[in-house]
Regions:
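Short acidic-hydrophobic sequence patches enriched in Asp/Glu that either
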Residues: 67, 71, 105, 109, ...
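Membrane-cytosol interface motif
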Residues: 63-73, 111-128
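Bilayer-spanning, highly hydrophobic alpha-helical transmembrane segments
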Residues: 20-99, 219-264
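Conserved functional loop/turn residues at catalytic and ligand-binding sites
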Residues: 118, 143, 254
Length: 264
């Protein structure tokens, strides 16, 4: 009974940690997502409503328009008259990517790409390291054999590259190879993960070592999430400026020219 209570306690703690990390990532993503939606709405309003209004006024006045104005007017006209084409392209790309990432090669390429993206890649690895070590510790502490525990952990991983590394590790462990070796050979997990596991293997204290690694990477995930958010905010604002400023200039430049001609 005491062993069962301990197992349930470990599983409960596991779920709490998972929920906390998931909530942290979702909470951190809310603000950037809102900013991106605002950019999309602002640009759509400017291109569909505001620019066409000024375009009709410029046509009435006549005269030569700056190149940037002509370019923005052309894009605006395309938005207004071919919006369904844009929606179809976006929907087609989304459907293609959704289907492609479900294929083995697509999932692997996408997983590899994500791991190479600055800030996002390290966050993914730290999240996977935290999840893997904590779940392994929980399962082993509940009496599950290492090979079986690795099989369950592998299925939990979302990144195909991480999943493949754990599949390979499971095969190696089933042949009697210590877990630390295939993890080190994979090139996916940070040195601290397999070094601490190696210490656990040598001392026979694997569960405690896994718990320590999980606790360390829990904090690392929080720090990496905050760093990613801090980097995304100014980047999104810069992208917004790069998109919106040319549109504003395209509208204002002919107006200033018109005012100058009237004043003259």
């Amino acid at each position: 009974s005491g062993g069962l209570d301990k197992a349930f306690s470990r599983v409960g703690s596991q779920f709490e940690k998972e929920a906390h990390l998931k909530g942290l990532i979702i909470k951190s993503a809310i603000y950037p997502v809102i900013l991106i939606l605002v950019i999309i709405v602002v640009v759509a309003i400017m291109m569909i409503k505001i620019v066409p209004t000024f375009t009709s006024q410029f046509d009435e006045v006549g005269g030569k328009l700056p190149g940037i104005t002509l370019a923005v007017m052309a894009v605006s006209d395309f938005f207004v008259h071919s919006w369904y084409f844009i929606v179809a392209i976006i929907a087609g790309i989304a459907i293609f990517i959704h289907a492609w990432k479900k294929t083995e090669s697509g999932a692997h390429i996408l997983g590899k790409f994500i791991l190479k993206v600055p800030l996002v890649g390290p966050l993914s690895i730290k999240t996977a390291s935290s999840r893997m070590t904590r779940t392994l510790s929980t399962l082993m502490g509940s009496g599950v054999q290492l090979v079986d525990a690795l099989g369950l952990v592998t299925e939990m991983m979302g990144n195909a590259v991480v999943k493949q590394a754990l599949k390979d590790a499971t095969e190696e462990v089933s042949r009697g190879i210590p877990l630390s070796k295939p993890l080190a050979d994979s090139g996916v997990f940070p040195p601290m993960v397999y070094h601490m596991i190696e210490i656990g293997e040598e001392t026979g204290n694997m569960e405690d070592m896994l718990d320590k690694v999980a606790a360390y990477y829990d904090e690392e995930v929080e720090s990496a999430t905050e760093a990613l958010l801090a980097a995304m905010e100014p980047l999104i604002i810069i992208v917004m400026a790069v998109i919106v400023v040319p549109i504003v200039l395209a509208i204002m430049m002919p107006m200033y020219s018109l005012y100058d001609s009237i004043g003259a």
